[in-house]
Swiss-Prot record:
Keywords: Cytoplasm, Metal-binding, Zinc, Zinc-finger. Residues 1-13 have a biased composition (Gly residues). This is Zinc finger TRAF-type-containing protein 1. A zinc finger (TRAF-type) spans 152-225. Pfam families: Sina_RING (PF21362). It comes from the Eukaryota. Residues 1-22 are annotated as: Disordered. The keyword Zinc-finger applies. Belongs to the ZFTRAF1 family. GO terms for cellular component: nuclear envelope; nucleus; perinuclear region of cytoplasm. Interacts with LGALS3. A zinc finger (RING-type) spans 111-156. GO terms for molecular function: zinc ion binding.
Length: 404
């Protein structure tokens, strides 16, 4: 026991409230702990005055003690490290307590997973912990990939689309919190920020009106008029513009070719479509893998099955931030002649997932009755997580039989 501890614990009765026993930090053996005690006593005395120590005084004394412990060369390294971390946390807490109300609300209303303010829907578990829509869907998708029950990262209660509900009060409160424009750095309510950044901000990034003839300029809106007055593209010769336009037309041609192909397929004699429901299953391997399969369905008087896999059945898809789905079409019935088909998958009538149409072709025979795995053309990993978070994946399959 140090001299400070002996004086604090075994001395005579304490003096008036707010005073410090005279023996604190005095006597043989008083070292760095005594300095911490004196600093704490000073903080308590200044904050509380003649009355009892208030909360601010106690917090200040605690922070000074932690700083002294962190700087004590005789303390064990682990203790110094813990004290330094605790001092930083105490300083952050003190700073947060003295900030504006909206700044303190950020930590109250933020998502418990990404620690950011939700941009759209806010979900809560049965104990009230908040999750933004993106993180909520991602938790459900990860649980599906790992064959586990999804749980709240805070309280570990079970979460699902049926157990969790939206918190409209938090959504409205977040929409009224001020947020900084990324261009002009002014503060606006979050509900008005998107409109400001798209239509009103003078510093928003915009494009030249001559981009249709190849001008690549991007810049702030308040410089647009000056640039367009000096833009060189309107004065280019016809041959120069033709070279630029040829490159711009290539992507447009590919898109038009795709839609023309779809229109041509719609004129075929034998066309079939059906709603398909991919259901999750697990392989029988030692390390199971998630895959999806539909019940058998009949289209064009034939029996079919669809299968799908995540990230091409990689070992740990839950460790990857990029999520993809690929699928294959299997013919389950026997055919007397080769069956040449075109097929494509689109979103179902009640889903909001974004899928780009891609046409695939295959000739089915009794010996070759399944296609290779082909990519499901989902826009990005966020849309893929939406599908994985659902109990089942509902899509619409179109089949076109090619007759010769």
């Amino acid at each position: 026991m140090s001299g400070a501890e002996e004086a604090g614990g075994g001395g005579p009765a304490a003096g008036p409230a707010g005073s410090v026993p005279a023996g604190v930090g005095v006597g043989v053996g008083a070292g760095p702990g005594a300095a911490a005690g004196q600093a704490a006593a000073a903080a308590l005395g200044e904050a509380a005055g003649p009355g009892l120590p208030d909360e601010a005084g106690l917090a200040g004394a605690r922070q000074l003690q932690l700083q002294e412990a962190a700087g004590d060369p005789d303390a064990p390294p682990k203790k110094r490290l813990r004290a330094a971390e605790a001092a930083e946390a105490a300083a952050a807490a003190a700073a947060a307590g003295s900030g504006k109300l909206e700044e303190r609300l950020y930590s109250v209303l933020c998502c418990t997973v990404c620690l950011d303010l939700p941009k759209a829907s806010v979900y809560q578990c049965t104990n009230g912990h908040l999750m933004c829509a993106g993180c909520f869907i991602h938790l459900l998708a990860d649980a599906r990939l790992k064959e586990e029950q999804a749980t709240c990262p805070n309280c570990r209660c079970e979460i699902s689309k049926s157990l969790c509900c939206r918190n409209l009060a938090v959504e409205k409160a977040v929409s009224e919190l001020p947020s900084e424009c990324g261009f002009c750095l002014r503060q606006f309510p979050r509900s008005l920020l998107e409109r400001h950044q798209k239509e009103e901000c003078q510093d928003r990034v915009t494009q030249c009106k001559y981009k249709r003839i190849g001008c690549p300029w991007h810049g702030p809106f308040h410089e647009l008029t000056v640039h367009e007055a000096a833009c060189a593209h309107p004065t280019k010769t016809g041959s120069e513009l033709m070279e630029i336009l040829d490159g711009m037309d290539q992507s447009h041609r590919k898109e038009m070719q795709l839609y023309n192909s779809i229109f041509s397929l719609l004129s075929f004699e034998k066309i079939g479509y059906t709603e398909v429901q991919f259901r999750p299953y697990r392989t029988d391997d030692f390390i199971t893998r998630l895959y999806y399969e539909t019940p058998r369905f009949t289209v064009l008087n034939q029996t079919w099955v669809l299968k799908a896999r995540v990230n091409d059945s990689e070992r740990n898809p839950n460790l990857s931030c990029k999520r993809t789905l690929s699928f294959q079409l299997l013919l389950k019935s026997k055919v007397t002649a080769p069956l040449e088909c075109s097929f494509l998958l689109l979103k179902g009538p009640y889903d909001d997932v974004r899928i780009s149409p891609v046409i695939y072709h295959f000739v089915f025979t009794n010996e070759s009755n399944e296609t290779d795995y082909v990519p499901l053309p989902i826009i990005d990993s966020v849309e893929c997580n939406k599908l994985l978070a659902a109990k089942n994946i509902n899509l619409r399959l179109f089949l076109f039989q090619i007759q010769k």
